[in-house]
């Protein structure tokens, strides 16, 4: 992402306020981009109040010597079959709250590395990184439960830059097979070709970064996976927007967007949807920093949806 673009600090401030919880690991600020600096009041931008949730937590040192937080909701402690959710990018409270709202058999691990999807992609480009992450999560969960833990399925969630980790993980065929579901929260991006040349000026999308998501979407359409993508109307300028990348998926997969007008979680306003098999795209209004954070705050509802597909 070029450094000559002026950073907009609004999303950074809001992310810190919206995702920080008690005794939580520091969250990397978003990389500089260009959401609209406009102040608007047409959407509520509701925020889930941070509070203590029942259940044990453990922390271990993971990729890039960053702390990984593991939370086992109180209702999960006695579950026989466990389901793992690995969340990339964003404070731990929202993912913890999200899994606590599901059936009492989910465990969540939260990974935060640094601003920008490239850091997440490079870190997990070595398949051993994800293998190690899963092994450590299993170890910590087993220690928490005082018994050997095994996971019936794995769901990966990426907010914003966190999609870079999922992209890298899914490139490995064994990991592609291991992952059962993916949830992308306003975080499917790629570069322009040539770099910094928007589509209006003749640029195209770097399709290489999207190929594995096309493959996962095809598997979801066949009913083999579950895949939900949400996006805003933010136009970063220096790299492709989530609207452009989801349009690409729609085109390549031969699908069609349907216009809708309905309320979403946290006061969000949904404008479009795509549904085929177990693959869905939901498009929402908004091109400012708070609209981006809305998608993270709505993780409980979106995670519930992808898990019930």
Where are each of the predicted segments found?
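Active-site machinery of serine-nucleophile hydrolases
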Residues: 79-143, 268-271
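Conserved hydrolase catalytic core segment
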Residues: 169-179
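Glycine-rich nucleophile elbow surrounding the catalytic serine of serine-hydrolase chemistry
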Residues: 158-168
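Bacterial N-terminal signal peptides that target proteins for export
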Residues: 1-8
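The feature captures the conserved acid-bearing segment of alpha/beta-hydrolase catalytic domains
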Residues: 183-290
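Alpha/beta-hydrolase fold nucleophile elbow
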Residues: 147-160
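N-terminal signal peptide c-region/cleavage motif recognized by signal peptidases
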Residues: 18-20
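A domain-start/cap signature at the N-terminus of enzymes
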Residues: 24-82, 267-269
């Amino acid at each position: 992402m070029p450094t000559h673009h002026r950073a907009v600090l609004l999303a950074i401030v809001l992310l810190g306020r919206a995702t920080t919880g008690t005794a939580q690991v520091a969250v990397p600020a978003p990389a500089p981009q260009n959401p609209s600096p406009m102040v608007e009041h047409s959407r509520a931008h509701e925020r889930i109040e941070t509070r203590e949730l029942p259940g044990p937590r453990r922390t271990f040192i993971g990729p890039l010597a960053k702390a990984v937080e593991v939370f086992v909701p109180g209702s999960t402690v006695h579950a026989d079959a466990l389901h793992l959710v690995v969340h990339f990018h964003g404070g731990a409270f929202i993912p913890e709250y999200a899994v606590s709202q599901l059936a009492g058999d989910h465990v969540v691990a939260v990974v935060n590395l640094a601003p920008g999807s490239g850091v997440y992609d490079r870190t997990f480009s070595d398949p051993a990184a994800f293998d190690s992450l899963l092994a450590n999560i299993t170890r910590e969960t087993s220690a928490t439960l005082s018994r050997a833990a095994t996971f019936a399925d794995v769901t990966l969630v990426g907010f914003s830059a966190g999609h870079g980790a999922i992209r890298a993980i899914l490139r490995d065929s064994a990991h592609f097979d291991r992952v059962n579901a993916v949830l992308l929260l306003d975080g499917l991006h790629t570069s322009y070709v040539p770099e910094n040349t928007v589509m209006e000026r003749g640029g195209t999308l770097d399709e290489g970064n999207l190929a594995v998501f096309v493959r996962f979407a095809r598997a979801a359409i066949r009913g083999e996976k579950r895949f939900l993508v949400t996006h805003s109307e933010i136009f970063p300028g220096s790299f492709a927007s989530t609207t452009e990348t989801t349009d690409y998926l729609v085109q390549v997969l031969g699908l069609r967007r349907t216009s809708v007008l309905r309320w979403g979680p946290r006061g969000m306003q949904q404008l479009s949807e795509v549904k085929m098999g177990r693959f869905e795209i939901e498009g929402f209004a908004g091109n400012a920093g708070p609209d981006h954070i809305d998608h993270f705050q709505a993780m409980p509802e979106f995670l519930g949806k992808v898990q019930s597909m």
